[in-house]
Amino acid sequence: MNTGTYAQTHETILKNGKELFLKEGFERANLREICRLSGVTTGGFYRHFKDKADLFSALVEPAIQGLQEQYSASEKMCFTVLENSGIDEIWKVSAEALEDFVSYIFDHLESFKLILCCASGTKYAEFTDWMVEREIKDMYKTCELLGKKGITVRRLPPKELHMLTHAYFSCIFETVLHNFKKKDALNSMKTLADFFSAGWRKVFGLGED
């Protein structure tokens, strides 16, 4: 039986929960097994977490919050560039933001493996769609800013825009699903940025330059 302090026991439960979630996935991971590995009773577990879902949240929320903060900073930078420079500069800045995004994911790889590979049965199974919806809001804002500059942007039907944006994030997250090394993932983002920037230019009617 665990005889450590509250903080030590808390960390032990987090450690064993993470290992079992990574191995079994959220749905198959057994709460009693987490308790057994951690040397606590189920009653002892509930002094730390409301339930298995609460434990999962504790493991992934810090990484998600950090990613969202980085994403917000990238948004601000991209919109500032768009307001003060031409359309061409935004593709370069967006590619750099993509590399930062992926670098953060690989610096918190176990958390994102939990989110992308092991979250079925939790609200985090919708993580990709959360990112898609946020990106689409940014695209609409980008279109508005370009319109103010006198640049005409073709409006895509919402379902088409969702489909293409989902494909974009799916490609990014493939690097986690298929166990890329960080260096290889970052290298692949250069190809991904070239591919999608050319595609976005085409479908939005922004030309080749």
Where would I find each of the regions flagged by the language model?
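Amphipathic alpha-helical segments used for helix-helix packing
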Residues: E75, F79-N84, V93, E99-T122
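Alpha-helical structural segments
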Residues: T12-E19, K23, E33, L37, ...
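Amphipathic alpha-helical segments that line or abut small-molecule/effector binding pockets
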Residues: D88-E110, H162, H166, S170, ...
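Hydrophobic/aromatic-rich alpha-helical bundle segments in the mid-to-C-terminal region
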Residues: N2, L114, L146-F195, F204-D209
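Short hydrophobic/aromatic patch on the recognition helix
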Residues: G39-F49
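Amphipathic alpha-helical packing segments from all-alpha helical-bundle domains
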Residues: D100-D107, T122-K148, K159-H166
